């Protein structure tokens, strides 16, 4: 179990040897035997990953990043499961590409957040600086360009990507500074975030409260305070069963 006070740590990676075709990256024949690093941030943990090209990636809780030990000459490809904030070193001759399920994001140098948890219904990409192109992994259609302050939402069920200007785009990376921000978030969304953030399990004992929504901002280092805030907003009651287990009704 990880402590509830998060400290950024430079990640130690597990080195994986990936041989053959069919891997998530689009590899040419001379890339087939690349050695890959897999970095995992468990629930209740955040990591800072330093990439071979000098780029930096902040990995949120319950997330995994896979990347080559050394990038290929003309591309820099990584895969993401979960959430991460990317600060990419500029190199126009070697584009940087993030693959997150059925979404691909291409950049040459910029800062952006990607939220791509497998259990979520959507994948969200929010751009802070520079510009990026976003599209479907296996689509031949032209990729869509994003500008700072925009968020792209990929709906998994419809397989559609929609880009919009987001007045709250700074919220996307608030987790880096250990802040929890919820805007019209359902109870399920809030509990899912808390479970990842604090490495706990919360069981809903009364389905009637599932329709409750929440709007609040707070520091992410005190679970009890967060639960008190939720209880002040809606008529819910949290009960601690064990150190890492709670119920709500």
What are these regions (language model features)?
Residues 3-249:
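A residue-level detector for the "anchor" residue at the start of short, highly conserved motifs
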């Amino acid at each position: 179990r990880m402590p509830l006070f998060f400290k950024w740590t430079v990640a130690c990676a597990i080195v994986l040897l990936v041989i053959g075709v069919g891997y998530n990256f689009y590899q040419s024949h001379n890339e087939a035997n690349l050695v890959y690093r897999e970095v995992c941030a468990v629930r209740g943990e955040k990591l800072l990953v330093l990439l071979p090209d000098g780029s930096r990636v902040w990995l949120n809780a319950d997330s995994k990043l896979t990347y080559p030990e050394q990038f290929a000459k003309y591309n820099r490809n990584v895969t993401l499961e979960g959430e991460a904030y990317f600060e990419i070193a500029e190199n126009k001759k070697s584009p940087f590409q993030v693959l997150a399920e059925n979404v691909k994001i291409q950049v040459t140098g910029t800062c952006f957040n990607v939220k791509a948890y497998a259990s979520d219904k959507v994948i969200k990409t929010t751009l802070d600086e520079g510009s990026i192109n976003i599209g479907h992994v296996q689509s031949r259609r032209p990729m869509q360009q994003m500008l700072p302050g925009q968020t792209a939402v990929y709906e998994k069920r419809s397989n559609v990507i929609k880009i919009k200007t987001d007045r709250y785009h700074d919220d996307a990376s608030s987790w880096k500074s250990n802040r929890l921000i919820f805007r019209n978030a359902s109870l399920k969304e809030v509990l899912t975030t808390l479970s990842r953030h604090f490495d706990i399990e919360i069981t809903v004992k009364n389905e009637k409260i599932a329709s409750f929504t929440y709007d609040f901002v707070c520091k992410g280092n005190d679970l009890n305070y967060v639960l008190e805030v939720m209880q002040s907003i809606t008529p819910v009651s949290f009960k601690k069963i064990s150190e890492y287990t709670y119920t709500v009704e």
